[in-house]
Amino acid sequence: YIGIIPARYSSTRLPGKPLAMIGDKPMIQHVCERASRALPEVWVATDDHRIADAVTAFGGSVMMTSPDHRTGTDRCAEVAMKIAGEDDVIINIQGDMPFISPESIKLLCDCFSDPLTDIATLAAPFARAEDMQVRHKVKVLVEDDGWVYNFSRTPLKKGTAGMDDPEDWMAKNFKHIGLYGYRYETLMRITKLPQSQSELAESLEQLRWLANGYRIKCAIIPEDTISVDTPEDLLKAIQSNKDNTH
């Protein structure tokens, strides 16, 4: 298993967020340290020298990538081509999840004990029913055997039976957490696929993979993890870090 953390400096809502300080460390260092407790090899993939310099300064492994990638998956594929072998599983870890637990990453890896798993991801129960109506909280409908049925920005149902009650919706819809694992060959193939109509409509690259028949296994973790997208999220992360270090 090889962990790759795609990290961009330019973010519309929070520029330079991988270098945002949480306590006495930049966010990217928090992510690297947690990933390294779960995986034998972890790399940061970036197109920005400021991020590369910061990673080198704390002793992390970093690789410069093309600035032209559309997605973090594409950035991962560029690095994987240089460092991974055909039997490797690549774990794509979001650089804006400073408190991702090593246990969650290990659960993601465990999905590959099933030889039918092409891709794996994580999800958590929604804390509140009203959160299911928030578009940026991506929903994933997970079958009882752990296979993903679909992803959407709106609540999902499979057929119409037994989904009248909000409790039923909550039982089937989980909050998607954007970590992915891919078998090496799968990663090489999915990054060459043309964008699907469903992907373009929802701005969710994982819909391209489902549309092309790739099987995605989803591990359920007990609760969501903080994702830093806005200045408000960063303040929450700083406070959470304080609460957990005292």
Summary of predicted features, one role per range:
Residues 1-46:
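N-terminal glycine-rich phosphate-binding loop and ensuing alpha1 helix
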Residues 167-246:
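Conserved alpha/beta core of the MobA/IspD/sugar-nucleotide pyrophosphorylase nucleotidyltransferase superfamily
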Residues 39, 85-87, 115-118, 214:
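Short, high-confidence coil segments that cap the C-terminus of an alpha-helix
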Residues 100-193:
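Conserved core of the sugar-phosphate nucleotidyltransferase
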Residues 46-47, 100, 182, 229:
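A conserved hydrophobic position in a structured secondary element of the catalytic/binding core
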Residues 41, 61, 213-217:
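Residue-level detector of anion-binding/catalytic polar loops
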Residues 43, 49-107:
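Short phosphate-binding loop-to-helix
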